[in-house]
From Swiss-Prot:
Any one biological process term the GO annotation gives: positive regulation of peptidoglycan recognition protein signaling pathway
PROSITE patterns tied to this protein: MPN (PS50249)
InterPro entries, per the entry: eIF3f, EIF3F/CSN6-like_C, JAMM/MPN+_dom, MPN
One protein family per Pfam: JAB
Subcellular location: Cytoplasm
Subunit field text: Component of the eukaryotic translation initiation factor 3 (eIF-3) complex. The eIF-3 complex interacts with pix.
Gene transcribed to yield this protein: eIF3f1
Family of this protein: Belongs to the eIF-3 subunit F family.
Protein name: Eukaryotic translation initiation factor 3 subunit F-1
Domain (MPN): residue spans on this chain: 8-138
Predominant localisation class: cytoplasm
PANTHER family per the UniProt record, alphabetical: EUKARYOTIC TRANSLATION INITIATION FACTOR 3 SUBUNIT F, EUKARYOTIC TRANSLATION INITIATION FACTOR 3 SUBUNIT F-RELATED
Keywords per UniProt: Cytoplasm, Initiation factor, Protein biosynthesis
Functional summary from the UniProt entry: Component of the eukaryotic translation initiation factor 3 (eIF-3) complex, which is involved in protein synthesis of a specialized repertoire of mRNAs and, together with other initiation factors, stimulates binding of mRNA and methionyl-tRNAi to the 40S ribosome. The eIF-3 complex specifically targets and initiates translation of a subset of mRNAs involved in cell proliferation.
Amino acid sequence: MSALNLTVRVHPVVLFQVVDAFERRNADSHRVIGTLLGSVDKGVVEVTNCFCVPHKEHDDQVEAELSYALDMYDLNRKVNSNESVVGWWATGNDVTNHSSVIHEYYARECNNPVHLTVDTSLQGGRMGLRAYVCIQLGVPGGKSGCMFTPIPVELTSYEPETFGLKLLQKTVGVSPAHRPKTVPPMLDLAQISEASTKLQSLLDLILKYVDDVIAHKVTPDNAVGRQLLDLIHSVPHMTHEQFTQMFNANVRNLLLVITLSQLIKTQLQLNEKLTFLPAA
């Protein structure tokens, strides 16, 4: 498959690690680079992890601690053998003159490595994210070179990552003086209530869009229409009594799980207190 047909999907933990490495950089370092880890399947490069590689950039050369990069990769393979080198990342918004030199090293480590740039300066109030592949250029018997060509990049996340991001969003907009250091997970019933409220607001938004299309206030979008049709077909057909019975059964199961978890928590707390009691 051609490198130009690749699509890059980046998980949130990768961006957090890039920002953390940028914040911990040396005072004389203007750019931070590192290795991207993940997997490649059917033209999709999924980046699930990364680590920083110490380096120094001079006018005519780049000094990188390659032994450190190999050690970090070997340690990561012991924890997660499914993650392989898929490319490299760098902070900044542009490809520099040293990028081709660094890319040559990663081209020896994997096939069709991708280059990810993360704009940590937050130009425009957003963290710019771009992905590139290096295409070889030249004529037979003449000089050859390479050109970094952009490819599609998007953010993706697993369900636990999505849950963690939602918890982090609760601190957005809070002043640093009142911002909590930790955000405890919500109780199960509170999560159901919040999810139901969000679902209701989304349904109201969909109904408003449909009403506006019927009233010719909004130009219909065929893609949105197909997605709404797929959504309707995904809803199981059942009567009101069947839905009520299913809902009540799920609520009873949830309440039972909450009760048992609270009993276990109380028992553990009691056991901890009894353990530290002085012997009579």
